[in-house]
Amino acid sequence: VLANTLPGYYGLAEGSWKHWCRVWDVDFDWIKSRFKDEKYMSKPGFTLSRWYEGVIQEDKISQYTPLKAVVFWGCSSNSQSQYHKLKKALDKLDLVVIIDPFPTMTAAACDKDNVYLLPSSSQYETSGSVTSTQRSLQWRYRVVKPVHESKDDYEIMRLFTEKFGFADKFYKNIKQIPEDITREINKGTLTIGYNGQTPERIKKHTDYWHTFDVDTLIAKGGPCDGEYHGLPWPCWTTEHPGTPILYDISKPVAEGGLPFRARFGTEYTYPGKPKESILAADGVYNPGSEVKGGYPEFSDVVPGTNWKTDLSQETIKTAIKRGMAPFGNARARCYVWEYPDKIPVHREPLHSPDKEMIAKYPTFEDKPDHYRVYTKFKSEQKPEWVDEYPIILTSGRLVEYMGGGAETRSNKYLAELQPEMFAEVNVKMANDYGLRDGDLIWIESPHGGKIKVKTKISERVDAKTIFLPFHFGGFFMGDTWAGKYPEGTTPYALGEAANVVTNYGYDIVTQMQETKTGLCRIKKA
């Protein structure tokens, strides 16, 4: 979930809101009236990594009121860094709602009233389209109806809209069925070419997956002949085969080829240089293109629209007929003029073990109103951190578990393979601290978080580093929360959440949390 854009990467500008209002067939002024102030329509919201600051306000927030409620819908709160601060936020909120097939660590974390668990069905109890990170789609068929007290996501959303009084607008032109929802996505998400993957086409690909070549992804014969498996976006029309590779000028656009997108205008003046074209050079184009070189994005085929906002999709169809990409043909951009660093520059982590590197490669200035919260960079990067916290801390995944582990740690077979939380410690570090394999240790962060975990001695980490898997939950700073789960739902595998001790640190552009480098100290428990 992105805090700075409407669906389909449309952003938050007025034109973007009006586009989606046309898709939904709702009045723009009604949408605007839902906001306390019009300025919040175009203001990025809190991100997943720092929403809790909107509650506890340890760093200054940039909105008229603190957050009062939170809904976790298939989201593991223990996947977020600074978890001990997130817990403070949970206990301060007026309302916490958890929608999940399993009671997550969030349910156990709340020491307050007004916490509601809404059991949702699993992927086997519902149907609909799903998209992979490879951009291909498939249709998920329901195996059984939702069991016990669970409801599928569609039903939960319907109940929400009815409770909040806008079901008539939410379902104005669609029914509460996945096929209609997919068609609405087809209609509105033109920016990335989601318009050609109709429910009927996706189902056909799922039903005839055996006709696709595993190497080329192309169907050989059958009803999907010549199409790429899953119709990877952009899939420009209902006749388009999908785009397996985003940049490929060896084949026509109509057959799955694409140039680079002309997303950043047609000209730019680089520092110390004259203005130059940033469209593709002459002679760089897809086979069959009417223009034998660069060209801008298509607009005004239908007056007053462009390829991203023309709901008739005539603009896209016209571009394809001319052998051209709707979004234009430009050069790859390696100089990103909107970013603080226009080209990649090394900046030392906020919590670095190397004082000389901090001096040589300092971080950014602090950033006020960074997704509605003041974010520290320079003021947080102190060379003296390493004097008290000399060990490098990193975290990552285990093959047996996924995300915060609520589902996978509730599987007894997976829990048997990885039953306990641990800290992976190098042999030399273990000997220096007098540790043996299986010893309990305390790990403390510079920000007040601490966890108690078992030592796993290994040569896979170096003598300066500790590794923590981030999937565990059910313990908090030495205390068990096993008894705080609803009866009969405690996961088989419990452990401290690594993100209690992951350090403060966020990306300057996206506000993604820093989980791969930080500092800590350890002592034998």
How would you label these PLM feature ranges?
Residues D94-P103, V143-T161, W442-S445:
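Phosphate/diphosphate-binding loops
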Residues D153-K203, E290, E297-V302, N306-P326, ...:
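Long, contiguous, secondary-structure-rich segments that constitute the structural scaffold
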Residues Y116, Y124-P146, T161, Y504:
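Glycine/threonine-rich phosphate-binding loop and adjacent beta-strand/alpha-helix elements that clamp
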Residues R22, V26-F28, R135-P146, K204-G222, ...:
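Hydrophobic transmembrane alpha-helix bundles
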Residues K60, C75-S76, V130, R142-S150, ...:
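Hydrophobic alpha-helical scaffolding
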